[in-house]
Design a protein with these regions (language model features):
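Long, low-complexity, Lys/Arg-enriched
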Residues: 1-101, 109-158
Length: 158
């Protein structure tokens, strides 16, 4: 079994009509399950538009998605991210046979750092870093803001 453990960020699921990191990883590293770790802001985005689950379903319709709602309101503070470490440790222990993919490209810089450290600390993990389509910052491309915009970007995704 291959499991993608991933935070979500504003570039997910799509930005500027291109895959965000989560979708890119699923296209190139098919997984059986996705464990989606959400901070409070991303929980609200998912609740409003189902953007992450819709995006995942658009590229991997048969994958199982488990959503972990952390309630974290300050993801820029390392001390708030122990919940992510604990969630991964629990999932890792629950699936001792799994191959793990870790998305180190989504979320705040602090979340990305924690994800990279998890990849170093646990065997059977592979850290996956996804560059932006422009190979530089995504500042010029706005993230999805409405469900209609999400559907348009998913349908026209390059």
């Amino acid at each position: 079994m291959r499991i993608l453990f991933t935070p979500a960020g504003d570039t997910d699921p799509v930005r500027g009509y291109h895959d965000g990191a989560i979708l890119h990883i699923l296209r190139h590293y098919p997984a059986d399950k996705v464990i989606l770790f959400l901070t409070k802001d991303m929980e609200e985005k998912e609740a409003a538009m189902q953007c992450y689950t819709r995006g995942i379903a658009s590229v991997a319709p048969d994958v199982t998605v488990e959503i972990l709602r952390s309630g974290i309101t300050e993801p820029q503070k390392y001390e708030k991210l122990t919940a992510m470490q604990d969630a991964f440790a629990s999932a890792y222990d629950a699936h001792p046979e799994a191959e793990w993919l870790l998305n180190v490209s989504s979320g705040t810089p602090q979340i990305k750092t924690v994800m990279a450290l998890l990849a170093l600390d646990y065997p059977r993990t592979k850290a996956i870093q996804v560059p932006s389509p422009e190979r530089k910052s995504n500042r010029g491309n706005h993230p999805c803001r409405t469900a209609d915009e999400l559907i348009e970007m998913l349908n026209c995704n390059e």
